[in-house]
Amino acid sequence: MAPSFGSYIAGCLALIGIIAALGLGGYWLRRWIVPEFSGALARLADATLAVALLVVSLQILGSLSLLYFGWIVVFCIGVGLGSAWLGYSKAGGHGREVAAPRVQDIALVIALGVASWTVAEWTFPAQSSLDFGMFGGDTTWYHMPFSAFIAQEHSTVHLHYTDPLRLAAWFYPASTELVNAATIVLFKSDWLAPLQNLIWLPIGLLAAWCIGRPYKVGPATLVAAAIVLDAGVMIETQPGEARNDIMGLAFLLAFAAFLINGHQRRAPAAGAVQDAPESDAPLLDKGPLIMAGIAAGLAASVKTTFLVPVVAIAIGVVIFSGRGRRWTSAWVMGLPMLVVGGYWYLRAAIKTGGNPIPITKFGPLNLPRPDQMPLDPRPRFAVIDYITNATIYRRWFFPELENAFGPLWPLILIMAVSAAVYIAWKSRNKILRVIAVASLLTAVVYVFTPLTAAGQEGSPTGFFTNTRYLVPGLVLAMALLPLARPIRAPDRRAWQTLLFLTGVFAITVLTTPRWFTSYLVGTVFLTLCLVWAPAALSLARSRGSVSRPAIAAGAVVLVLLAVVLGRAQQVQYADQHYVNPDPFLGEGGPKEAYVYTQKLHDQRIGIIGSSQIIFGQYGFYGNDASNHVEYIGVHGPHGANRLPTSCAQLRGLINQGDYDYLVMSQYTQDTGPYNTGVANPYQFPVYAWVKGDPAVMLVVKDNLASPQPDYVFKVEGKLDPSACKPEKRPEVPGEEPIE
């Protein structure tokens, strides 16, 4: 059942107030920090500051365990208005706006067309998720469970254990999940979660435009980035899901845009900038450095994979700042980067006893990390493991690269690498060289990253989805491509480059259309809100053809329409999501467990089992995401979570958890001595350990689930650990042998 109409209106008013206050705060802070920014660049800075204010505000509330409706509304609005007052009092009318070179109207139309198509194509999976639920593996494994847990606990202090895997996902940065948690609190529903990534996509496209803005090639840099952002792997993994790559990509591009525009602040009154600014000028003024640090912090607060390009670019900027300016550049950019992006790493360091990134020991430093069992979603092969295997290229890498980046993937990769190498080697612009080197370094690190070719040996089934880890370097390199001097000067050559990139975009996206007529009305409305209206109002305002009251009136109309349509969508989402998991889970997931637990409210559910339980666990949170779901494990030092290794231990943990229900598979691993004869010391018969206890009642038995049956038990009392029968099992590394 959907939340009441009154709670919906309260949530809408709260969200509108928060967005308005934080937007106002971002606007006036930008007027103070970078008064020279204008047009699209100013709007990008406004958005970046507003998002940073939101994320930091929620982190503060989460640290104080105050993520309640009232506190979120009052504190976020207060922070926004306080920031607006501070910016207004400090701005003082100082600083001259630097206008961008005027682009041709036809180039602007092409850029808007590409942006519209990209956003429109993203809306279809988003609307599908609003109808059926989010079924992406990472979404249901940890992204949405983290959001629901934070919303339920009203806190970011505690770790939420989702599995016993080596990755220790509960230490991942979680800014996207935190924003989703806030919307769950505001609306008493997670119905906005499938739409969140549609907010970050336009910010990423705007940032891509701004990368080329001072060179008069903004349309070309937008199109080049859109080739990657609208590629198959992005469409399959981002829109309509809680995966967070797009938020990181948006602010990584913003990081680059602020550095490039800040470096070229002394642009001529007309025409594009030259390759280098004044010889006696500092590399960057403090304002652009602050903005760059904020954007970099936001990117790093999303996903650890963004640390490579962020840190590489930051180090390069400091090095090239020159003697006598390096320390100033380091602290001016580094301080906001740490404030905005350091929260999750600080939390991890506190929980582990000193390690901000617990997935690694940092080599000789040997920092503490959780002692996880050596279990992975798939065998952890990297691309480098198959680097000389021609068969893998032919059967896996080449076909999946085509699925990920379209039929022109060889051309796209060649263009990206060539642009990055050329700019790193030949450009006289230090900032461009730093970004180019960072993009190449990110690609190299991707090749060596575990799980980029995950799967059984000789069968890297995880290669396609994990090409996402190549995307940060690829999108940076593609955005730099139109800045290479041989293809942007003179203007005629820049125009040819734009047309060529538009052709590549068209071939890439038109070969795999994902348009559904039943969603066209929603697509038109979302594209209107996210692309057409902002672009039209901004363009009209910059050319003086529309007054501010008219812009405000247009915004009010769109907001009112969104509120009306939103209620209908919220009700439909409550009635339909996760009701029919068959088209998505097929025979590979806990379908009957989904159907049963969707009817439960405010129940404590313990889960244990193999992959289908781990990766599908968000479906057990119930229709209103009110069930408290956690993986039943043995908590250890430094934030570890390990499998129980005996019947008595499992029953004791169930008693400690005070669960109302249990959801489990037959074994904790899909292969092992109990069913395949393969040696696997981590395959435990958890169903057999529990089923005979009179304190549990079997309510769901799904023998058709694959690769092994799933079960739901209702817990009616305390289980008896002493009643477990003696058994002899394979010895578990790191555990005492049990007879």
Task: Please annotate each region the language model reported.
Residues 97-105, 213-221, 269-287, 321-332, ...:
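Membrane-interface helix-loop-helix junctions at transmembrane boundaries of multi-pass membrane enzymes
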Residues 657-739:
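Aromatic/acidic, Gly/Pro-rich catalytic loop(s) in extracytoplasmic/lumenal soluble domains
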Residues 126-138, 165, 458, 514-524, ...:
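Membrane-proximal, lumen/periplasm-facing interface regions of secretory-pathway glyco-
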